[in-house]
Regions:
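Small-molecule kinase domains that catalyze NTP-dependent phosphoryl transfer to phosphate-bearing small molecules
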Residues: 107, 115-160, 164-168
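P-loop (Walker A) phosphate-binding loop of NTP-binding proteins
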Residues: 12
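ATP-binding Walker
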Residues: 15
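Conserved substrate/cofactor phosphate-moiety recognition/catalytic segment
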Residues: 21-67
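Hydrophobic anchor at the beta1->P-loop junction of P-loop NTPases
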Residues: 9
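Conserved phosphate-donor/acceptor-positioning beta-strand/loop module used by diverse small-molecule
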Residues: 81-82, 97-116, 146
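Walker A/P-loop
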Residues: 18
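Loop/turn-to-beta-strand initiation segments
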Residues: 34, 74-82, 102
């Protein structure tokens, strides 16, 4: 059986992973109906409320997401997974265990993230914000980096990503 591709979109909250990921999902679905869209916030709801936002819990959550992506990929399903994914160990695991793994790092400045803060995370002061209260491990070897400080629309970002993927 052919394995699916896992498009792992990673960045901090508010950088655009869900928006760009949803556009990518729709684009793939036009030609390949066997694709699913997974978002970190939704996955937390699906898996239940047993994990919080400590560094240890975030790592457990990220590994759940990674294993689910591998399971789906092993069954020939393409997966667009949008998650903060702040650990090198998780991204390394993905590269070692998911044959069709594509890592997309969407990078935005903290100033941009604070402006876009729809969830109120960057002003909450609750001590659990990745990239503010917890240092993240920025991806060292993403397949592509999409700078997203507002110079391009999500559709333009998608076009850059699609052009990159077509070259692969």
């Amino acid at each position: 059986m052919t394995t699916g591709t896992v498009y792992w979109l990673t960045c901090l909250s508010g950088a655009g992973k869900t928006t760009i990921g949803w556009l990518l999902y729709q684009k793939i679905r036009e030609k390949q109906p066997n694709v699913v869209f997974l978002d970190g916030d939704t996955l937390r709801q699906v898996f239940g409320d047993d994990l919080g936002y400590t560094r240890e819990d975030r790592l457990k959550s990220a590994m759940r997401n990674a294993r689910l992506c591998r399971l789906l990929s092993d069954q020939g399903v393409d997966v667009v997974c949008c998650t903060i994914s702040m650990f090198d160990s998780v991204r390394d695991w993905n590269r070692e265990n998911i044959p069709g793994y594509v890592e997309v790092y969407i990078k935005a400045s903290l100033q941009t993230l604070q402006k876009r803060d729809q969830k109120g995370l960057y002003t909450s002061g609750d001590g659990s914000v990745a990239g503010v209260d917890y240092m993240i491990e920025e991806p060292k070897h993403p397949d592509i980096v999409l700078p997203n400080d507002g110079d391009l629309t999500p559709e333009q970002q998608l076009q850059i990503l699609v052009q990159f993927l077509q070259k692969e």
